[in-house]
From Swiss-Prot:
Domain of life: Eukaryota
Gene name linked to the record: spn1
Protein name from the UniProt record: Septin homolog spn1
Residue segments, region G4 motif: 243-246
Biased composition (Basic and acidic residues): 13-24
Source species: Schizosaccharomyces pombe (strain 972 / ATCC 24843)
Length: 469
């Protein structure tokens, strides 16, 4: 069986017949001696002296700024952490929820069986094809089938969600609405579970990937398919595939892929592309580039074994002009789809689902009137904290200084008012005293004049008396 990438991006099963990013499993099963050699090799690349990182206290906080690299003098043991995580993942198992979305007869059940290399949906079961009778009602149903798959001791709980009736009617107006409602309902269910349980114990019901079947018309994507992708691309990881690609010639297939990608880019539809990380080795980068170049995947699915021109039994389809092999990358993009979906990027799909869920959760809580104080989640930087405290202290000092200036101004104003009042009182008293003095002076002058007149009259009387004598 092929290798599988399971929880947290950790490959747990490896097959020598397939080379993939799951080859990293060798490091998980290595012995202590090999681990010791890897640690010593990593240590030898560092310099002997300590390397303090330059202080960037005035810059934006970086959690790696305060790290000081030191040379290890011996084996510590943290190199075995991947082994511990591997044992935990194997013990708990994994779950993966995939939505297959397309019209009836697109080959959805065949693709699922081919993808897992077993009859998850037997030919007699019509869960992915639907049976509506003679006069079906224009209704899209949502069916979910769970199956537990064990490969080399690794348990995978796979939930396949199908949509019988999708796109099968003359009037397909809003045929995607039940699908969107189901996706959002699973988000709401997960949100409700979060309120009462730790995330590590929750059985994740969210849709991790949506395999969207595009009809092989040989032309561009249809208007209905475009509307469906526009309605779902913000809620789920869309993986577009061209169903029954063996019905198209090479030129028609290349033209169809080009037109689909052009429409997706023009309408800003977000589909899932394998992410590339700086730590990826050149082989992984090349594999990612090869996978991205195949999107949308041209799929040929079959559970039938036929004999090819070389006399080998292979899964495929026989035509009068030759044999089409399912697992041959020259005939079909199915191997790359399986590699991305299960072997290399299963955990990236779940991580991207977390991002889509967080966006939905935020929108849902905000619409309910619940807002989050983002300051609670700010990283604590000592230098930034000191700078913040210094700014608060300066603000406090400035406030105290302003208050003191206000009080001082009030005191000065009150003093000036009292001085002006005293000055006015003194001026009033001065005027009153001056008026009193002027009056007293006038009285004295009047009294003097009367005395002078009396004296003159007395002297005149005296002189008259002497004359008569």
């Amino acid at each position: 069986m092929a290798s599988m990438v399971l929880a947290d991006g950790m490959p747990t099963v490896k097959d020598d017949s397939t080379r993939s990013r799951g080859s990293d499993v060798d490091s998980f099963t290595s012995t202590d001696n090999v681990t010791q050699i890897n640690v010593e090799a990593a240590i030898s690349e560092n310099k002997n002296e300590e390397k303090p990182i330059q202080d960037n206290s005035e810059q934006e906080f970086n959690p790696h700024v305060s790290i000081i690299q030191r040379q290890l003098n011996g084996y510590v043991g943290f190199a075995s952490l991947p082994n511990q995580w591997h044992r935990r993942c194997v013990r708990q198992g994994f779950n993966f929820n995939v939505l297959v979305l397309g019209e009836s007869g697109s080959g959805k059940s065949t693709l699922v069986n081919t993808l897992l290399n077993r009859d998850v949906y037997p030919p007699t079961q019509k869960s992915l094809t639907g049976d509506f009778g003679v006069n079906p009602e224009p209704t899209v149903m949502i069916n979910s089938s769970a199956v537990e798959i064990v490969e080399n001791g690794i348990s995978l709980q796979l939930n396949v969600i199908d949509t019988p009736g999708f796109g099968d009617f003359i009037d397909n107006t809003d045929c995607w609405q039940p699908v969107l409602t189901d996706i959002e309902g699973r988000y709401d269910q997960y949100l409700e579970l979060e309120k009462h349980n730790p995330r590590s114990t929750i059985q994740d019901p969210r849709v991790h990937a949506c395999i969207f079947f595009i009809q092989p018309t040989g032309h561009a994507i249809s208007a209905m398919e475009l509307r469906v992708m526009l309605a779902l691309h913000e809620k789920v990881n869309i993986i577009p595939i061209i169903a029954k690609a063996d019905t198209l010639t090479d030129d028609e297939l290349n033209f169809t892929k080009e037109m689909i990608l052009r429409d997706i880019q023009y309408h800003n539809i977000r589909i899932f592309f394998p992410p590339t990380y700086e730590t990826d080795d050149p082989e992984s980068v090349a594999e990612n580039a090869d996978i991205m170049s195949r999107i949308p995947f041209a799929i040929i699915a079959s559970n039938t074994f036929v004999v090819n021109n070389e006399g080998k039994r292979v899964r495929g389809r026989r035509y009068p002009w030759g044999v089409v092999e399912v697992d041959n990358e020259e005939h079909s993009d199915f191997p790359k789809l399986r590699e991305m979906l299960i072997r290399t990027h299963l955990e990236e799909l779940k991580e991207q689902t977390n991002k889509l869920y967080e966006a939905y959760r935020t929108e849902r809580l905000l619409s309910s009137g619940i807002s989050q104080d983002h300051s609670v989640f700010r990283e604590v930087n000592p230098s930034a904290k000191l700078e913040e405290e210094r700014a608060l202290h300066e603000e406090k000092l400035m406030k105290m200084e302003a208050e003191m200036k206000t009080i001082f101004s009030q005191k000065v104003q009150e003093k000036e008012d009292r001085l002006k009042q005293s000055e006015n009182e003194l001026r009033t008293r001065h005027r009153e005293m001056k008026a009193a003095l002027e009056k007293q002076k006038a009285d004295l002058i009047d009294h003097k004049n009367r005395l002078m007149q009396a004296k003159a009259a007395a002297e005149n009387e005296k002189s008259k008396r002497k004359f008569f004598k």
